[in-house]
Amino acid sequence: MFVPWLSPTGSAETPDAAAPLGAISDTPRVLFRVLASGSSGNCSVLVIENEGVRRACLIDLGLSPRHTLRLLGEMGLRPDQIDDAILTHLDHDHVKLGWCKLLPAHARLHVHRRHVPRARSMGLRPVHARFATFDDRITLHPGVEARPLVMSHDEDGVVVFRFEFAHATRTPETPDGAAAPGASMGFATDLGCVTGELIEHLYGVDVLAIESNYCPRLQAESARPEYLKQRIMGGSGHLSNQQSLDAILGAEPREHVVLLHLSRECNSPAIVREMHEGSDYALTISSQFEPTRWVQVGAHAAASRA
């Protein structure tokens, strides 16, 4: 499910943003789309178009390869265009071992260094693709970087990413009215808590994808066992709707917010939509069952703040 792009006045723009990609853009652009998000599987895609080349980076591999490749094909993406897959952490809903055999030979699977022991123990080793470890910024392509921040989540932690695209342009207000160089996107899920370091890491991104996992009231009223409730709400599990909103308000994203990992049992799109009414950023709510629309990174800042 998604929410139409909203201007500050509440009017909706409805571009045909769910259609296949079609021809490569003549000008550099970055597109983002969530294929699925939730406890049954998480996978998103970044598409980077520059100098006549289209490249894709998958963020998490929590859907089966067959399902993911089918969705990508429907979106106009080929397997050979997948250059990178980057993992936030290694929970079963964020990585499927079937990808070890099916990532293209030229692709890189990026795993944080602190996750490597668990990756080895669970047999996460690509057959054809390169296994790339990191603990500092990743250069995906010239002018495309991912800056990591490790946050608390269960035992091994989770990586929050700030993606920076030097070749893309955004359209904020500049003195001469020209497009400003550079665009950025934050991706944060399974966090557990909001810290000043997190806010600083994500501050001012053009697009912010962040989890809004549960409503505390619904969580308390649910039939879930107490240990599970404590795991989720205890500071190293997931963000509540209010915690997510606090993080968004602190980070001040320029144009668009994409909400991730909504609990089907302890949350609802209607609850989170109401919490974000009147905001000056566009809002998209991801789903476990269908992809979101395409979100262009860096293209709508001026329109959303006009």
Please describe what each predicted stretch is.
Residues 1-75, 159-189, 207:
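Conserved beta-strand hairpin/beta-sheet module of binuclear metal-dependent hydrolase folds
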Residues 16, 113-182:
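Metallo-beta-lactamase
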Residues 37-40, 63-65, 90-93, 152-155, ...:
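Short beta->alpha connector loops
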Residues 55, 64-111, 206:
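Active-site metal-binding motif and surrounding structural segment of the metallo-beta-lactamase
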Residues 57-62, 83-91, 109-113, 186-189, ...:
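Active-site neighborhood of phospho(di)ester-bond hydrolases with catalytic His/Asp-centered motifs
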Residues 95-105, 121-122, 268-274:
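Metal-dependent catalytic neighborhoods of phosphoester/phosphodiester hydrolases
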Residues 144-151, 295-306:
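Short, surface-exposed amphipathic charged segments that create phosphate/polyanion-binding patches used
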Residues 195-291:
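Cap/insert and terminal regions of metallo-dependent hydrolase folds
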